[in-house]
Amino acid sequence: MPQAVAGPEIERLIQLLGRMPGLGPRSARRAALQLIKKRETLLAPLADAMRIAADRIVVCHACGNVDTSDPCTICRDETRDPTTLVVVEDVSDLWALERSGAVKARYHVLGGVLSALDGVRPEHLTIALLVERASAPGVKEIILALNATVDGQTTAHYVTESLKPLGLTITRLAHGVPVGGELDYLDEGTLTAAIRSRTAF
């Protein structure tokens, strides 16, 4: 076990930062040092923001987004298209779509994907709530914005079957060549998906 190089408070900060996705021990140490160096301009404001977030953040009972109000800002936004529900795996996917500005609809966060390997079954996700929301008067289209993984595809098929009796239009995001992508660098699966979902130019 490596020897501690600082007091227990700093070691705890490094440990906690190291639990963040994408931050290993070395990156956590660097981040902790940056926070310590910029104590007044970064560490103190960050600590305040985290304290406030811990006290006020809630999960929206309607869509599953995280916000400081329930229903969330998106669900309360009356300018959004009430006829369309965009289904995503996680809040991070919802935020990515919002950053793109490509859709001005309402969302539904499943809370994950079906996975036999990880033991995630339909009752572990918010699929029943999705069916209930999709049954509401005025809903016409469900956009499946799920990741193009095996578990994502399995979940998309299950959700489609669950919603089929409602007679709604069910669409999914196109798969294929990313903007700025070069064909030579793409895998065969991506190229196949791009060919199959080609559109008129």
Curated annotation (Swiss-Prot):
Zn finger (C4-type) location: 60-75
Pfam families: RecR_C, RecR_HhH, Toprim_4
Residue ranges of coiled coil: none
Xref: PROSITE patterns: RECR (PS01300), TOPRIM (PS50880)
Gene Ontology MF terms in the entry: DNA binding; zinc ion binding
Keywords on record: DNA damage, DNA recombination, DNA repair, Metal-binding, Zinc, Zinc-finger
InterPro entries the UniProt entry points to: DNA_Rcmb_RecR, Rcmb_RecR, Rcmb_RecR_Znf, TOPRIM_dom, TOPRIM_RecR
Domain Toprim: from-to ranges: 83-178
UniProt-listed GO biological process terms: DNA recombination; DNA repair
Keyword Cell division: no
Superkingdom of origin: Bacteria
Entry annotated with the keyword Aminoacyl-tRNA synthetase: no
Record's function text: May play a role in DNA repair. It seems to be involved in an RecBC-independent recombinational process of DNA repair. It may act with RecF and RecO.
Homology family: Belongs to the RecR family.
Classification via PANTHER family: RECOMBINATION PROTEIN RECR
NCBIfam families: recR
Protein's name according to its UniProt entry: Recombination protein RecR
Organism: Methylorubrum populi (strain ATCC BAA-705 / NCIMB 13946 / BJ001)
